[in-house]
């Protein structure tokens, strides 16, 4: 039934003819004046009329589709030719305000498929820019968009500058996941690239010859994030930071709220109780002051203290892949 369309009443004289659209006989048919028909309307007794089998051709040909749309609009402005089965899906997309090369799509476990010839990423290609995300959905996939000339720009970049960029923590070792949440990172500390990435940079020919390339997206998950400045002894916390799944660091330059010291990356941890490892617990004593239902509303925050609203509805976090 995808090849047919039902309209609330007939298109042609007698509400029963099956004259194909576009034939010369169509112009000769005239519908009777509605004022002359004093009886009950025919379309109330008949559920609808099936457009002939040549109707799908009007969906392919733009001229014929416009002709069919004009015919339907003359009968009822609210009618539109629905000749194809709707197979669409609503997705939320947010583009980076600075560089629109990273797009965040709320597709859940599914990701946005790319039909372009540059699905994979070259080992020498620079890392994508930061994106903007909000805690609206649980898991999201990332897909990158390229511009014309990006390949030339990536070739023009020198090697040391590329190595100085923060590496994406997609393939972290198990040591990072088991680190103590109380251990904090120095402001100038950077992570070294993993051996797999180093090997792929040293042997670009083997990586290009592999039929299966590494996907250019990574899943994100919300975790509890906190900041600690050792210079001014200031600690402030925030929650539901979107980081790469399986890691505990977010690559976004953060400034201290007191001394404006910058450090990157900052550490995050799971949004759960450190005593019983549950999202909702009833432990009499907690290691930190945090409401697990509203982890951003706490004394150490300062952004939403003594406020009537929850910060979980008004803020978003950035990350660098």
Swiss-Prot record:
Subcellular location: Cytoplasm, Cytoplasmic ribonucleoprotein granule
Functional description taken from the UniProt entry: mRNA-binding protein required for maternal mRNA storage, translation and degradation during oocyte maturation. Probably promotes formation of some phase-separated membraneless compartment that stores maternal mRNAs in oocytes: acts by undergoing liquid-liquid phase separation upon binding to maternal mRNAs. Binds to the 3'-UTR of maternal mRNAs, inhibiting their translation.
Free-text comment about domains: Disordered region at the N-terminus undergoes liquid-liquid phase separation (LLPS) for the formation of membraneless compartments that store maternal mRNAs in oocytes. The 3CxxC-type mediates binding to the 3'-UTR of mRNAs.
The keyword Transferase is assigned to this record: no
PANTHER family: PROTEIN ZAR1-LIKE (PTHR31054:SF5), ZYGOTE ARREST PROTEIN 1-LIKE ISOFORM X1 (PTHR31054)
Keywords assigned by UniProt, alphabetized: Cytoplasm, Developmental protein, Differentiation, Metal-binding, Oogenesis, RNA-binding, Zinc, Zinc-finger
Zinc finger (3CxxC-type) boundaries: 222-307
Gene Ontology molecular function: mRNA 3'-UTR binding; zinc ion binding
Region Disordered, residue ranges: 110-214
Family matches, as InterPro entries: Zar1 (IPR026775), ZAR1/RTP1-5-like_Znf-3CxxC (IPR027377)
Composition bias, Basic and acidic residues: 145-154
One GO term (biological process): oocyte maturation
A Pfam family it matches: Zn_ribbon_3CxxC
Main localisation: cytoplasm
GO cellular component: cytoplasm; cytoplasmic ribonucleoprotein granule; intracellular membraneless organelle
Family statement: Belongs to the ZAR1 family.
Protein name: Protein ZAR1-like
The gene coding this protein: ZAR1L
Keyword S-adenosyl-L-methionine attached: no
Assembly, per entry: Interacts with YBX2.
């Amino acid at each position: 039934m995808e090849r047919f369309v039902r309209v609330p009443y007939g298109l042609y004289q007698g509400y029963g003819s099956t004259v194909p659209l576009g034939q010369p006989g169509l112009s000769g048919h005239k519908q009777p004046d509605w004022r002359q028909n004093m009886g009950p309307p025919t379309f109330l007794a008949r559920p609808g009329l099936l457009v002939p089998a040549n109707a799908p051709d009007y969906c392919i040909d733009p001229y014929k589709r416009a002709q069919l749309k004009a015919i339907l609009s003359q009968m009822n402005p609210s009618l539109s030719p629905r000749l194809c089965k709707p197979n669409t899906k609503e997705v939320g997309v947010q583009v980076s305000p600075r560089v629109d090369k990273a797009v965040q799509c709320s597709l859940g476990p599914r990701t946005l498929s790319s039909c372009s010839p540059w699905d994979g990423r070259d080992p020498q290609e620079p890392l994508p820019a930061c994106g903007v995300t909000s805690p609206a959905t649980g898991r999201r996939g990332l897909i990158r968009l390229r511009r014309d000339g990006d390949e030339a720009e990536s070739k023009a970049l020198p090697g040391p500058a590329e190595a100085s960029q923060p590496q994406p923590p997609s393939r972290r070792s198990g040591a990072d996941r088991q680190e103590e949440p109380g251990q904090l990172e120095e402001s100038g500390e950077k992570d070294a690239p993993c051996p797999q990435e180093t090997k792929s940079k040293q042997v670009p020919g083997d990586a290009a010859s592999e039929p299966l390339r590494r996907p250019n997206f990574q899943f994100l998950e919300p975790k509890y994030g906190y900041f600690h400045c050792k210079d001014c002894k200031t600690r402030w916390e925030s929650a539901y930071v979107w980081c790469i799944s399986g890691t505990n660091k977010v690559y976004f330059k953060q400034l201290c709220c007191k001394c404006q010291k910058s450090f990157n990356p900052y550490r995050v941890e799971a949004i759960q109780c450190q005593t019983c490892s549950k999202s909702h617990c009833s432990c009499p004593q907690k290691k930190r002051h945090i409401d697990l239902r509203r982890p951003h509303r706490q004394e150490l925050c300062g952004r939403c203290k003594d406020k009537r609203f929850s910060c979980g509805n008004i803020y978003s976090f950035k990350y660098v892949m």
